[in-house]
């Protein structure tokens, strides 16, 4: 926060332009989240438990050389010299934000190292990780909140703007990939393509069919939860498909997104529902004569939650959490579609007929409910998924990044190719086990590999 105006519309537009990178410098950043449960009682770990979240963070910091991140004397995250970090989602979900890396071999290896570290610690401390899109057993009031002030502000505001925002915060997990863009034209094409295709990713990665020990009626309950969270900051912004879309239009959209907080001198101030535009003009209620800094703008960008989000890179946000092979498969899917020019052209051609917000809203619910058997526009999602996997496979082949054994990045698409071959999403497989060998005992879910 500043005492004089240092930001204007042109400068915050420039911030997105400053994210442009030459093709040879494009990197891949992967983020993935896990639920942590006590192994004996199958309750979500709380922050202050004897061997809870804070204890785990301290153990990683002290034994594995991670730097601590604190807020109000509470340990809330870690960062590593490699560029990766560990942060806490509102209900104690562990999120690894991977370092930006050059190829999928590197990013998959990084995810594997993190999971192996967490498995080692989980065995020592008697907790279990679960890689799903939605907590399969816990009720809202059984989940403890993490001591982060921004979460307290969001917790208080969410019920005013939607029915499922609290569930989104504490009962969901996702896998995301962050990708670069060359210039404004490239950003536009990647943004429009990926936004129109998110329901396909939602279907392929659907992995959240349970709620509170029962069937949820959805294959991706996580995706459905987002449909009733906060319509002003989530979903499919129609501006993305407008003929004049670009950095300026995206900035206008973000200025229309209500604020949540201001962070200044180590303290969070609740400004939920207020206007960033007024803040820019020094007229924010309660903060008259104060103006945003660039870091205030960066914070504000993080409280928009569309299915694809532009920061200084593009975030793909439509997939459920899952195990290691799908943590590798999600970036592989999108890198194959967007990081090779022919693949981008081909996937844009596929996506073009879906670039309608009403259609996409319907398609997301269809994907969440029926997975590959859902509908996108006039097409079956399974058919579009097959076309996209073919395009992605060819794109990864043309990238021609091979590991030390000469194997290309296409190997990371294998879980998705198997899904299409069998016609069963991860959620379908869970339902088959639940209704079969598990004999409807939801606690058998803790035996699956994560």
Name what the model sees in each region.
Residues 274-358:
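Long, well-ordered mid-to-C-terminal structural blocks that present hydrophobic/aromatic surfaces
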Residues 37-39, 99, 180-182, 319, ...:
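Solvent-exposed residues in well-ordered beta-strands and their adjoining turns
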Residues 35, 95, 176-180, 315-317:
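Structured core elements
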Residues 400-404:
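Charged, low-complexity interaction regions
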Residues 1-163, 171, 206, 326, ...:
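Terminal catalytic/cofactor-binding subdomain
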Residues 123-124, 129-130, 134-309:
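Loop-rich catalytic cores of soluble enzymes, especially ATP-dependent carboxylate-amine ligases
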């Amino acid at each position: 926060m500043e005492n004089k105006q240092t930001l204007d519309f042109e400068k915050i537009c420039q911030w997105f332009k400053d994210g442009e990178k030459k093709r040879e410098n494009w990197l891949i950043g992967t983020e993935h989240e896990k639920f942590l449960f006590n192994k004996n009682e199958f309750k979500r770990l709380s922050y202050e438990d004897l061997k809870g979240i804070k204890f785990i963070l301290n153990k990683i910091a002290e034994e594995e050389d991670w730097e601590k991140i604190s807020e109000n004397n509470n340990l809330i995250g870690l960062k590593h010299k490699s560029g990766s970090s560990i942060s806490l989602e509102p209900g104690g979900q562990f999120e690894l934000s991977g370092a930006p890396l050059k190829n999928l071999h590197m990013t998959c290896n990084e995810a594997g190292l993190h999971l192996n570290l967490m498995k080692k610690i989980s065995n020592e401390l008697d907790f279990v990780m679960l890689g799903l899109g939605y907590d399969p057993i816990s009720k809202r009031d059984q989940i403890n909140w993490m001591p982060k002030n921004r979460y307290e502000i969001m917790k208080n505001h969410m019920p005013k703007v939607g029915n499922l925002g609290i569930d989104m915060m504490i009962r969901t997990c996702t896998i995301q990939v962050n990708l670069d863009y060359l210039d404004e034209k490239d950003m536009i094409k990647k943004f429009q393509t990926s936004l129109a295709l998110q329901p396909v990713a939602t279907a392929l990665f659907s992995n959240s069919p349970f709620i509170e020990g029962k069937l949820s009626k959805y294959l991706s309950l996580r995706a459905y939860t987002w449909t009733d969270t906060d319509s002003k900051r989530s979903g499919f912004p129609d501006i993305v498909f407008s003929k004049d879309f670009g950095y300026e239009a995206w900035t206008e959209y973000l200025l229309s997104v209500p604020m949540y907080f201001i962070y200044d001198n180590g303290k969070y101030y609740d400004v939920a529902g207020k206007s960033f535009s007024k803040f820019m003009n020094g007229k924010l209620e309660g903060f008259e004569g104060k103006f945003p800094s660039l870091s205030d703008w960066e914070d504000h960008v993080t409280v928009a939650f569309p299915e694809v989000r532009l920061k200084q890179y593009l975030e793909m946000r439509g997939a459920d959490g899952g195990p290691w092979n799908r943590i590798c498969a999600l970036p592989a899917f999108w890198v194959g579609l967007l990081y090779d020019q022919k693949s981008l052209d081909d996937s844009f051609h596929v996506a073009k007929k879906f670039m309608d917000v009403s259609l996409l809203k319907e398609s997301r619910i269809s994907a969440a409910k029926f997975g590959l058997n859902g509908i996108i526009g006039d097409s079956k999602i399974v058919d579009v998924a097959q076309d996209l996997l073919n395009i992605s496979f060819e794109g990864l082949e043309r990238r021609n990044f091979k590991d030390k054994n000469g194997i290309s990045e296409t190997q990371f698409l294998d879980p998705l190719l198997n899904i299409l071959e069998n016609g069963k999403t991860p959620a379908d497989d869970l339902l088959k086990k639940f209704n079969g060998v598990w004999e409807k005992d939801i606690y058998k879910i803790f035996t699956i590999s994560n």
